[in-house]
């Protein structure tokens, strides 16, 4: 426990909280050609590479990912959720934060149903997370 005199001399130091999605914390000023501290919830980017990778030890799959160059100039690896996708090189995508636990180095997700990314087809539940429009009432009965 510090004395009052020690607190007056030094004071309390704030904890430094490290961001889990640092690329979204930086903006870019194209006029000054410099980075800014303007953070945002999502950022637009262009796919530079689309591929699959295998997850960490107990799991086994081919997880889809895209390497994305964001508008602030930073290049990140983002996960493509859902079954099937239409992304290829030069596709414009919207990237949000959120890591994938079993893929090392993947700290971002691609938002389905935004910009060039199509929503997941034939999705009935949890549609908002996969950018799927609401099915028409007559269509659901006809498919069964």
Curated annotation (Swiss-Prot):
Residues 1-55, 119-144 are annotated as: Disordered. GO terms for molecular function: rRNA binding; structural constituent of ribosome; tRNA binding. Residues 124-144 have a biased composition (Basic residues). One of its GO terms (cellular component) is small ribosomal subunit. InterPro entries: NA-bd_OB-fold (IPR012340), Ribosomal_uS12 (IPR006032), Ribosomal_uS12_bac (IPR005679). The keyword Transport does not apply. The keyword Glycoprotein does not apply. Keywords: Methylation, Ribonucleoprotein, Ribosomal protein, RNA-binding, rRNA-binding, tRNA-binding. Disulfide bonds: none annotated. The modification 3-methylthioaspartic acid is found at residue 102. One of its GO terms (biological process) is translation. NCBIfam families: rpsL_bact. Part of the 30S ribosomal subunit. Contacts proteins S8 and S17. May interact with IF1 in the 30S initiation complex. PANTHER family: 30S RIBOSOMAL PROTEIN S12 FAMILY MEMBER. Belongs to the universal ribosomal protein uS12 family. With S4 and S5 plays an important role in translational accuracy. Interacts with and stabilizes bases of the 16S rRNA that are involved in tRNA selection in the A site and with the mRNA backbone. Located at the interface of the 30S and 50S subunits, it traverses the body of the 30S subunit contacting proteins on the other side and probably holding the rRNA structure together. The combined cluster of proteins S8, S12 and S17 appears to hold together the shoulder and platform of the 30S subunit. This is Small ribosomal subunit protein uS12. It comes from Brevibacillus brevis (strain 47 / JCM 6285 / NBRC 100599).
